[in-house]
Amino acid sequence: MQLNSTEISDLIKQRIEQFEVVSEARNEGTIVAVSDGIIRINGLADVMQGEMIELPGNRYAIALNLERDSVGAVVMGSYAGLAEGVKVKTTGRILEVPVGRGLLGRVLNTLGEPIDGKGPVDNDGYSPIEVIAPGVIERQSVDEPVQTGYKTVDSMIPIGRGQRELVIGDRQTGKTALAIDAIINQKESGIKCVYVAIGQKASTIANVVRKLEEHGALANTIVVVATASEAAALQYLAPYSGCSMGEYFRDRGEDALIVYDDLSKQAVAYRQISLLLKRPPGREAYPGDVFYLHSRLLERASRVNANYVEKFTKGAVTGKTGSLTALPIIETQAGDVSAFVPTNVISITDGQIFLETDLFNSGLRPAVNPGISVSRVGGAAQTKIIKKLSGGIRTALAQYRELAAFSQFASDLDDATRAQLEHGERVTELMKQKQYAPMSVAAQAVVIYAAEKGYLKSVALNKVGHFEAALLSFMNSEYAALMTNINATGDYNADIEGEIKAALDKFVATQTW
């Protein structure tokens, strides 16, 4: 039988009409390009934003760009051995890190793997690094203090549990020192700490870990490290990993403190990844979502109410609120706080502590500028005794700076102006504090009381430090019960004021400084 051309044409049309295209979801793809830690994959039909993609050799990449015909992913770690044609698989999982009490005292990388040589970590489970922050109804107002141990901060820029307080300044102005001292001061407070080091030298981080260990604070702290030599992806993800580890304590009705050191380097790492993924650059070449990069991280620091904790723990913990307090650090260039990332983080946080190079170089350490440093919510959380006593400190310093500038041009000053200048000089001198020497609430209260009530008038400017040291030694030996009472309660009443006044009168009479 011979078919003519018309029949053949009809047969082909019939077959074409009967043909069904079956779309098959594939979870395996092929690398089509590798460059600078970025891989482009074809053939992944079923992948979600932020999903872990399994690579050969027990390595992973994270899918960040989902395009029409390919997926752009960033490799976590080394990309040696990855080449065009290599097969990869989706996992269906978002990146998770280990969490739990067993992480305290350990040094971990971004993925939660131990890098301190102390064996495997004893974790209570895993938590995704990206979690939606608690909503408005689940939160509670900030009304309990986090004592940093710094007179300047605790008296003028108080920090509350659940607050986000930015530490901002140029390089070498004492930002890390302030944050580390705040961690050291928590060893007796019950607040668990997380220190996230982003883009720093390994030697610097080793020194920080050693100092925490020396001062007995490492046992209470988790250190998460993404050094300068590690892949940009790990530097970008490190703060989210640390935050999940801190949230473990918050969600179980405990208090935690997290330090991000520093978010400028995280933003640079994210900019690098975004540019390599060919996302359109914006201001200062940062991508358009760099604000969201930091806002979604810092919003997770919060104080949650008892209902949230009870619901999260399925009734295992009742009547307890939890908190995660954040101290993000931002490094400025030549004091420019109006740059893109600093202004973003200032607008996200609940206040900022400005550290200035000029103050640091003049010997005022911590180099806090009280004029432009502010705590927007911490005032409600300040310890009662410090709040009552420290009201005049900020005013004295502000008046002193104004008068000091004016007095350079005035040949003769009246007695009132001279008295204000001398008081301001002594308060400024009193605010100086050595590193790794955080002060208790009672010690701060006694010292501030001495300044406010004029006990420093007769003390020579170069003797203020000696006066403070001798006063605290005297108080701890002669009035130990009073100091213990103030530390325990934080109260301030006529009886406590009378005792402090009597103690100071007795001390000043000895002239032992």
UniProtKB/Swiss-Prot annotation:
Signal peptide: none annotated. It is found in: Cell inner membrane. The keyword Ion transport applies. Keywords: ATP synthesis, ATP-binding, Cell inner membrane, Cell membrane, CF(1), Hydrogen ion transport, Ion transport, Membrane, Nucleotide-binding, Translocase, Transport. It comes from the Bacteria. One of its GO terms (cellular component) is plasma membrane. Its EC number is 7.1.2.2. Pfam families: ATP-synt_ab, ATP-synt_ab_C, ATP-synt_ab_N. It catalyses: ATP + H2O + 4 H(+)(in) = ADP + phosphate + 5 H(+)(out). The record marks 373 as: Required for activity. InterPro entries: ATP_synth_asu-like_sf, ATP_synth_asu_C, ATP_synth_asu_C_sf, ATP_synth_F1_a_nt-bd_dom, ATP_synth_F1_asu, ATPase_a/bsu_AS, ATPase_F1/V1/A1_a/bsu_N, ATPase_F1/V1/A1_a/bsu_N_sf. ATP binds at residues 169-176. GO terms for molecular function: ADP binding; ATP binding; proton-transporting ATP synthase activity, rotational mechanism. Gene3D superfamilies: 2.40.30.20, ATP synthase alpha/beta chain, C-terminal domain (1.20.150.20), P-loop containing nucleotide triphosphate hydrolases (3.40.50.300). Its main location: membrane. It is a peripheral membrane protein. Belongs to the ATPase alpha/beta chains family. Produces ATP from ADP in the presence of a proton gradient across the membrane. The alpha chain is a regulatory subunit. F-type ATPases have 2 components, CF(1) - the catalytic core - and CF(0) - the membrane proton channel. CF(1) has five subunits: alpha(3), beta(3), gamma(1), delta(1), epsilon(1). CF(0) has three main subunits: a(1), b(2) and c(9-12). The alpha and beta chains form an alternating ring which encloses part of the gamma chain. CF(1) is attached to CF(0) by a central stalk formed by the gamma and epsilon chains, while a peripheral stalk is formed by the delta and b chains. NCBIfam families: atpA (TIGR00962), PRK13343.1 (NF009884). This is ATP synthase subunit alpha. The gene is atpA.
